[in-house]
Curated annotation (Swiss-Prot):
Pfam families: DUF1040. InterPro entries: DUF1040, YihD_sf. This is Uncharacterized protein HI_0845. It comes from Haemophilus influenzae (strain ATCC 51907 / DSM 11121 / KW20 / Rd). To E.coli YihD. The lineage of its organism: Bacteria, Pseudomonadati, Pseudomonadota, Gammaproteobacteria, Pasteurellales.
Amino acid sequence: MKCKRLNEVLELLQSYWSKDSDLSLMEILQKIANESGFQKPLNELTDEVIIYQLKMDGTDKYEPIPGLKKDYEEDFKTALLRARGIIK
């Protein structure tokens, strides 16, 4: 499990870092923390925050989260009817 997560971080980080290749790793991590609104010290930055921020890089701020997008409904009434099984 750890190996999969590490590979995911490295894959996402590679494309992100290539945009600012002159920055050091710590500067890149600080940039990710700033973009995500992380206010704590950098050593408390979790891999979940890093992965999420890297996955959402370049997307609209109000775009639904990719994992939740399949269940996303624009209209509350439709979402309620779908949740109750009235419509498919």
